[in-house]
């Protein structure tokens, strides 16, 4: 005998957890493995930053699409009576907000500062905008950290919903 849940929407919940796990894994991989590796291996920090920025932009778009899809699925599960997914929607909404701020506010602003500096023949870190760029980078890093922690919490909560503690 197994203690595996056999609820009506068990497969949908498993798919939800699977997609969420892959997504959060990609966030962690990009932010805490790929980006640091780029800066550690490429000698030109400007190039490393541009490549990392492009990768983070793709990750932000993936986050936006997956987050919206998961919110739709969570709404469907709530409408089918799985009320525990109400709280999951709030986590997803916060993650969506993090991705949107990064993708539509911070990254374009930083790209603009970088392009402006390059048009003047210098890397952004040697331009008059270096301080602002560093501040924006710090804010973007903080938001990405919040999104990553929310993602870890999301997967933790989802795994508890599918595999509740047995007494």
What are these regions (language model features)?
Residues 7-20, 86-96, 151-160:
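Alpha-helical transmembrane segments and their helix-start/interface "positive-inside/aromatic belt" motifs
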Residues 69-80, 143-165:
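Transmembrane alpha-helical segments in integral membrane proteins
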